[in-house]
Amino acid sequence: MRSDAMKTGLARAPHRSLLKAMGLTETEIERPIIGVVNAHNELIPGHIHLNNLVEAVKAGVRLAGGTPLEFPTIGVCDGLAMNHVGMKYSLASRELIADMIEVMAMAHPFDALVFIPNCDKIVPGMLMAAARLNLPAIFISGGPMLAGRYQGRDVSLSTMFEAVGAVQAGKMTEQELAALEDCACPGCGSCAGMFTANTMNCMVEALGMGLPGNGTTPAVSGSRVRLAKEAGMQVMKLLQENIRPLDIMTATAFRNAVAVDMALGGSTNTCLHLPAIAHEAGVKLDLNTFNEINRRTPQICKLSPAGSQHIQDLDEAGGIPAVMNELYRHGLIDGSALTVTGRTVADNVSGRVVSRREVIRPVEDPYSREGGLAVLYGNLAPEGAVVKKGAVLPEMMRHEGPARVFNSEEEAFAAIMGKQIKPGDVVVIRYEGPRGGPGMQEMLSPTAALAGMGLDSSVALITDGRFSGASRGASIGHVSPEAAAGGLIALVEEGDIIAIDIEAGKLELKVPEEEIARRRQNWQAPPPKITGGYLGRYARMVTSGARGAVLE
């Protein structure tokens, strides 16, 4: 056993004394030592209940003959970090999480690991660590929050962000906003729509790193606790059979995950996280692959923010196994990929029935013939830009309008709330990329304000930053190269015409080449916004959003 390095033999008597100091018996020390990575904290609704799942995981490990030992990691709540300096730290926390887990698992030689994440950057950070360490491992996520209820309809956090814009536009009163505030997020779990956290938890299942049900079983369900116990038991089987993350997270598994992502209409943040996880696994996954799979994979689900349904509806409809079976039956995913069940994707999903066809449509009758995400290219984004196509209104699939240029999210949000943005405009938010931000902030507040004001049908927004999975509308992010790296977005001037064609995958600045060359001669990179601390180091080491914003 790997853990023998800290517990077996004469020279390890001091080590055993330390283990005994924590109350471990000889029998417990002799058993396989299983690290339980707990992302619990009291800041994230999606993580507030994780200690209960940790205890269930430990029970499962013990039932299967192992000794569980728990350690923590950090987690940022993107909702609480939104629209202030805290959001600069969100994406950057992903690398910290992976690094911290590496430190703990290398300093203390566990035999296997159980990862317990739930929210936005914690899931990919843990998947990166799992690939890097390549110890037998399994994931059990915290599960989705139930949707709230307001005036007879389902609501969630995205409803709250859009309500801010509705109040500003006079479409909603502050009293109505306060009433909505009390019921939009009814309890624990990752925010209820197909936002980033739930998209990534579904990706855990699609990649094969979580048991069936991991992506959609509600946080408050007894089924989630049972799933945690099963995960604790299953990690012992993975250890016994020596099945490791790199046996599971293969090129085939990543292509399957992208196909599931397209079918779900998931968050654009998968275009950052899946390539970063693949990078750790030694698998090439770029935006061209996303584009290729998008072109052949129909969108068969349309959950909030693109539609009115939430993750609980997807769970009732059959969950990710039903979605994957729908794709598998039509040759859109590869059933031979191995999973943490010890069986293949085909074994796991074959025969899974769709019980609510209004939630999971047939491949023959999809919401759209292509996937829910699209990659755009053009002179504004030669390395690519990303849009949640499934959440764009039909009238905004093609748009041409004058640029309204802002050098920060804060400037843009103030202009939107000040009613300075008019129908037809293209809002440009730059110097918010991985390096320029630094940290590639999410632009949920600006996009939600536009939607709440009713401008999502006439205004587009492009940025070298990124978006929350709760954003909707013609919100085009990850523009690469970013402004701080000298990308063309840095040279856009107020009033320039920008042409967007999402169906054709085009993003163009309509300015003559001679004028662009003149502007480039006069352009100078602005000084870094932050030079010290972790963010300063991050800004110096981070790569393009087109590469997953990994560190080099």
Swiss-Prot record:
InterPro entries: Dihydro-acid_dehy_C, DihydroxyA_deHydtase, DiOHA_6PGluconate_deHydtase_CS, ILV_EDD_C, ILV_EDD_N, IlvD/EDD_N. Its EC number is 4.2.1.9. It comes from the Bacteria. It catalyses: (2R)-2,3-dihydroxy-3-methylbutanoate = 3-methyl-2-oxobutanoate + H2O; (2R,3R)-2,3-dihydroxy-3-methylpentanoate = (S)-3-methyl-2-oxopentanoate + H2O. Keywords: 2Fe-2S, Amino-acid biosynthesis, Branched-chain amino acid biosynthesis, Iron, Iron-sulfur, Lyase, Magnesium, Metal-binding. Binds 1 [2Fe-2S] cluster per subunit. This cluster acts as a Lewis acid cofactor. GO terms for cellular component: cytosol. Pathway: Amino-acid biosynthesis; L-isoleucine biosynthesis; L-isoleucine from 2-oxobutanoate: step 3/4; Amino-acid biosynthesis; L-valine biosynthesis; L-valine from pyruvate: step 3/4. Mg(2+) binds at D78, D120, K121, E442. GO terms for molecular function: 2 iron, 2 sulfur cluster binding; dihydroxy-acid dehydratase activity; magnesium ion binding. It holds the Pfam family ILV_EDD_C. Its cofactor is [2Fe-2S] cluster; Mg(2+). The active site is at S468. Homodimer. This is Dihydroxy-acid dehydratase. It comes from Moorella thermoacetica (strain ATCC 39073 / JCM 9320). The gene is ilvD.
